UniProtKB/Swiss-Prot annotation:
InterPro entries in alphabetical order: Ribosomal_uL6-like, Ribosomal_uL6-like_a/b-dom_sf, Ribosomal_uL6_a/b-dom, Ribosomal_uL6_arc
GO molecular function, one term: rRNA binding
BP GO terms, sorted: cytoplasmic translation
Described function: This protein binds to the 23S rRNA, and is important in its secondary structure. It is located near the subunit interface in the base of the L7/L12 stalk, and near the tRNA binding site of the peptidyltransferase center.
Alphabetized SUPFAM superfamilies for the sequence: Ribosomal protein L6 (SSF56053)
Lineage, broadest ranks: Archaea, Methanobacteriati, Thermoplasmatota, Thermoplasmata, Thermoplasmatales
Source species: Picrophilus torridus (strain ATCC 700027 / DSM 9790 / JCM 10055 / NBRC 100828 / KAW 2/3)
A Pfam family matched in the record: Ribosomal_L6
Similarity field: Belongs to the universal ribosomal protein uL6 family.
Gene: rpl6
Subunit: Part of the 50S ribosomal subunit.
Protein name (database record): Large ribosomal subunit protein uL6
Length: 180
């Protein structure tokens, strides 16, 4: 018989519901629903009352690291479904004016460094991207997906075969924050 000891507890706000099925924690709030799969042999997450608890069967550095990661992931899920997250990016160009637009699930960058063919970046499901002037705003409830979308946009404007000290064009992350 394995003895499980509780290591962390996250209290759920009143307007948030949580369910656990097959190692998948689903958090539902006023902005939507987010989920994360928590699977490990020595650490388990479960729901008891109005809180999410994380327990371990061993007490070592490995399991302490997993407990801390799962704790922060759960807090981010709760924060995402109650407040939401927002990333701000800046369109920066000096040589060639680029045109940025959103088409479906892609962000299209045209005339980047005078290139004839447009570059595209995938927008991950659950993210809303808007372009106003030289700013791009990414909104959503899952911080991982928003970060992945921001990374896709930055990677689409990566400069190769030019001197990066001279050609400083691109789209760069300014800040990521929680909506208030």
């Amino acid at each position: 018989m394995i003895k499980w000891t509780e290591q962390a507890e996250i209290k759920l706000p009143d307007d948030v519901q949580a369910t656990m099925e097959n190692n998948e924690l689903k958090i539902k709030g006023k902005l939507g629903e987010a989920s994360r799969i928590f699977r490990d042999n020595y650490v388990k997450a479960y729901i008891e009352g109005s809180s999410v608890k994380i327990a371990t069967s061993k007490n070592n550095k490995y399991t302490k690291g997993i407990v801390g990661t799962w704790y922060s992931e759960t807090k981010l899920l709760i924060e995402g479904v109650t407040k939401g997250f927002e990333y701000h990016m800046k369109i920066d160009f000096t040589h060639f004016p680029m045109r940025v637009s959103v088409r479906g699930d892609k962000l299209i960058v045209e005339n980047f460094l005078g290139e004839k063919s447009p570059r595209s970046a995938k927008i991950v499901d659950g993210c809303k991207v808007s372009v106003k002037g030289d700013r791009i705003t990414i909104n959503g409830i899952d911080k991982r997906k928003i970060g992945e979308t921001a990374a896709n946009i930055e990677r689409a404007t990566y400069i190769r075969h030019f001197d990066a000290r001279v050609f400083q064009d691109g789209i760069f992350l300014l800040k990521g924050e929680v909506n208030e």
